[in-house]
Amino acid sequence: MSGHSKWHNIQGRKNAQDAKRGKVFQKLSREIYMAAKSGGPDPSGNPTLRMVMDKARAANMPKTNIERAIKKAEGNSDEHYDEITYEGYAPGGVAVLVEALTDNKNRTASDVRVAFTRNGGSLGATGSVAYMFDRKGYIVIDRSTTDADEDQVLLDVMDAGGDDLETSDDAFEIYTDPKQFTAVRDALEKAGYKLANAELTMIPQNTTPVPADKKEQFTHLIDALEDNDDVSNVYTAAADDDE
């Protein structure tokens, strides 16, 4: 099927974050550390670690930084981060999910709440918007890296166990059941595809247009959340401008 490109949005955010590369690497180091600490330092036996390492490489994080975070997890460090999800609404009633890794839950909760309230949003209770999103595996193949056409990619995706294929001018975007994500990713790599992105993500069941007079506030809110050192991911149900 065809549709709006989540990959296009990701690329836009990535370009915007290039100026904040140090902060991005700091967050990725934390994710790598936690993945290695909880599941072991070998990515071949730790799918979560492998996924985060792939994410770090896609962000052009130096290999030495990745190795340092893994070695730290192997050592005697007693650093611990809690995984917390915050839920709320952005200006215009757009649902927002915020995933954080924090060593101080009170600090992070306060910072997230301030970001919402200062930018026209509201932080909600647990369960207030999470039901509006589905956990999915998300894999991207840059069309410039393959000679396969849409029909061939669709066949390979179905053979691999993927759920859905969306096409855009620059990418093939594959969605999977989260439990099948690793198997689908590995099958597509074995089939010779070079993956531009492979991660677990949250997909909104429905999208909400951001009112024109709320777009600036909406952007400021998302920027404030993504700039927070403890925030790993921000997901919204905002509709693209071309939807």
Swiss-Prot record:
Region annotation Disordered: where it falls in the sequence: 1-22
Classification via InterPro entries: Integrase-like_N, TACO1_YebC-like_2nd/3rd_dom, TACO1_YebC_N, Transcrip_reg_TACO1-like, Transcrip_reg_TACO1-like_dom3, YebC-like
Record GO terms (molecular function): DNA binding
Gene Ontology BP term (one): regulation of DNA-templated transcription
Gene Ontology CC terms, in alphabetical order: cytosol
Keyword Iron: no
Disulphide-bonded residues: none
Cell compartments where the protein resides: Cytoplasm
SUPFAM superfamilies per record: YebC-like
Alphabetical keyword list: Cytoplasm, DNA-binding, Transcription, Transcription regulation
PANTHER family reported for this sequence: TRANSCRIPTIONAL REGULATORY PROTEIN YEBC-RELATED, TRANSLATIONAL ACTIVATOR OF CYTOCHROME C OXIDASE 1
Family: Belongs to the TACO1 family.
Protein name: Probable transcriptional regulatory protein LGAS_1276
Natural source organism: Lactobacillus gasseri (strain ATCC 33323 / DSM 20243 / BCRC 14619 / CIP 102991 / JCM 1131 / KCTC 3163 / NCIMB 11718 / NCTC 13722 / AM63)
